[in-house]
Each structure stands twice: as C-alpha cells, then as structure tokens.
C-alpha cells in the first residue's frame, strides 16, 4: 500500500508548522475547556467544597494522564520516522503494536489508580472535609484510563501521518456531550464531583471509539486492520524505549507537583480552592504549547527518517520561537483578565483573590518552560529519551522537592512555593546542551549529502 500520509519533508517549514499546529492547539484547548467545564459546573452549582474535592485530585489526574500522553508522544516519533522513510510495512507493525501496548498500559493505570486512590489522597494531606468527594471523583475518573490511552494512541498516529484535524473533530463531538452530561449529572441528578467524573469517562470512551473507527476506515498507511493486531517484538521495544521515558518525564512533573500540592494543602481551604481554580490556566497554556512540541517532534522525526538535515534543525528553532511567543501572549492575557478568568470557576471573592496570586506569578513564568519542553520534544524526535529524562528528574523532580523542604519550609508563603516553577525551568534548560550533542551524533548516521548540506563532524 502506498503511503497517502501528509508529507512533512517538503515545503515551507514556517507555514507547515503553523498549519500543522493550529488544529492540535484547537484540540488541546478544547480538551482543556471541557475539563474546565467540570470545574466550572462543580464550582457554580455544587459549591466550594465540591470544587475543592475536584481540585485536590488535579495532581493525581495529571500523573495518570501525563504518562499516557507521554506514551503517545513516543508512538508519534516511531510512526513518523517510518512514514518519512517510506517504510510502509514498518508503519503497519508500529501502529498495531502501539494500540495493544496502549490498551495494556491504560488498564494497568486504571487498576492501580482505583485501588490506591484513598492512600494517595491521604499522602497529599487532602482535607477531611474534601476526602469523600475527592475519592469518588478520582475512582470514577480512573475507569476512563483505557479510553484515554486509546485516544492518545490514535491522536499520535494521525499526527505522525500529518493529520491533526480528525482528532479535533472527534474531541469536539465528545466534548459537547461531556458538557451536557456535566450539567445533567450535577444540576439534575445532584451527583456533584462524582457526576462530572462520570460525564468525563463517557465522553472519553466516545472519543476513543471515534478515533478507532477513523483508523479502521483510513485509506492511508496507518489504517488499522484486525488481522494485523499483534505485538511485533522489535517495534514494541522501539515504542517502549521512547514511550516509557516520555511517559516518565510527564509523570515526574506530576510526582514533583504532588509535593507542591501538599504544600498548598498546608494553607486554609480558601487557598486550596483558589489554587484549584487558577491551576486551570496551567493546562490552558501548557496544552497550547504542547501542540507546538508535537509539531516539533513530528517534523523532526519524519525529516530524520527522510534524511533532511536542514529541515530537522530548522523545525526545532521555529518551534522554539513559536512556543515562546505564544506563551508570552497568553500569559499577558491571563494576568490582565485574571479576575474574569477565575470568575468562570468561583463566585467567592476570597477564593478569586487567592487564585490571582498564582496567576500573577505563573504568568511571568510560563514562556520559559519552552526552552525545556521544546528541547525535550526535539531529543525525542531524534530518538533519544534517556539523558533528557535524567535531566528532568534532577531539575523538575529532585530540585522541586528540595525547594519545598528548604525554601518553602523556611518562608512558608504561597509565593515562595509558586516561584519554584521558573527556577526549575531555568535549570532544566540544560536540555539544550544535550540536544546539540544528540543532533551531531544522529546527523553522522545519515548519508553525507542527502539534502545538499554536507554533514558536520
């Protein structure tokens, strides 16, 4: 079967990266908005206690979903590289192997999350008044992990093939259903936090079904065929060697944030609720930037498979500038219109005041995460994940934990807690040094004049 996938190895890079990223941004923003609808509906119609219950689970939700998103990014790189190299049989094997692996991981996370929810929430120091609602919300949410794993698999495969529009359509359909179910379960059925969790998992299974149906009907090289559903050992090793470190990188952020959440929980309930409301901005900014990182990884991987040196490194720099600039604009808007933003989630003035503290500090910090995250995506696009993972562990996990137990413990102000983000991003910008070495090593593996630029030693 000839590949009918979108070619990312020819044409004007700036235009291509922008056009590739925009549907991904819309997809990610819609996902964030639908997640925000959970918080908004709970905050407006179920009260501050239910809002705090949902907010208390946010770090654990990020831990589980972050690992699955990382799995997807590894799948994206492997599939994109084979598409770029025009190795259709390898694409088939990678796609079908990845689907089975994703399902297995999703089921494992579901089981572990469901069983250990009370213990994990207790470790975070969740307030007793919020515990029952938090346990109910998180356990129900965990039942949707297999569906989320499948959707992330499909999103990764379609993006690797250059199609970023279909996931947007699927998520839009599932998201509208999610909002309607949120309102029904909370307002009509009075299920509070459990209601929005139930709405979420129903919409997740709908989006997973849509993406699988699309791949089954696809006329391109990424078509799913029942007869090919098996784990091919070599492809499994390739996928896991990138997916597990990528998943761990995302999970490590969440693990470090567990300690940060414990720090937030040491303040009163108003601060916890304000933090929960303001933290929605994190997802909004990060997920818009993440669309560009996916573009960076996809373009670099396809062009590496095709042996296009200049396009590989240019993809990185264009993505870096693009993500930094967008973060600056979004940060400015959040700081200027912060009170209006927080008003979506709470009508309690004291909660909004607490949330503004986080928005102001994080608004000055978001853009600097591009140096780390875009470089992580670039390393992954070149097939290297181990060293970036070590750097992230040291800079974003170990350092943040040390900060919580030293700087924050000494000052014990919410400002001293939030400032650790920008400092840790500065440290993990050392990823850029790692990329230079990885790039030089990988370029030596390509034929010397494949794109008209002689390889450098």
Q: How would you label these PLM feature ranges?
A:
Residues 19-38, 140, 151, 174, ...:
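Transmembrane helical elements of multi-pass membrane transporters/channels
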Residues 63-66, 178-182, 208-212, 284-287, ...:
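Hydrophobic transmembrane alpha-helices of multi-pass small-molecule transporters
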Residues 51-111, 148-167, 261, 274-338, ...:
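Small-residue-rich hydrophobic transmembrane alpha-helices
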Residues 29, 33-51, 121-128, 184-191, ...:
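Helix-terminus/linker motif at the lipid-water interface of multi-pass membrane proteins
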Residues 1-21, 79-146, 188-244, 300-365, ...:
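Short alpha-helical transmembrane segments in multi-pass integral membrane proteins
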Residues 8-45, 59-74, 78, 103-110, ...:
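N-terminal transmembrane alpha-helices
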Residues 42-62, 128-133, 193-194, 198, ...:
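Interfacial/gating helices of multi-pass transporter permease domains
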Residues 72, 141-159, 167-175, 196-211, ...:
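Short runs within selected transmembrane alpha-helices of multi-pass transporters and secretion channels
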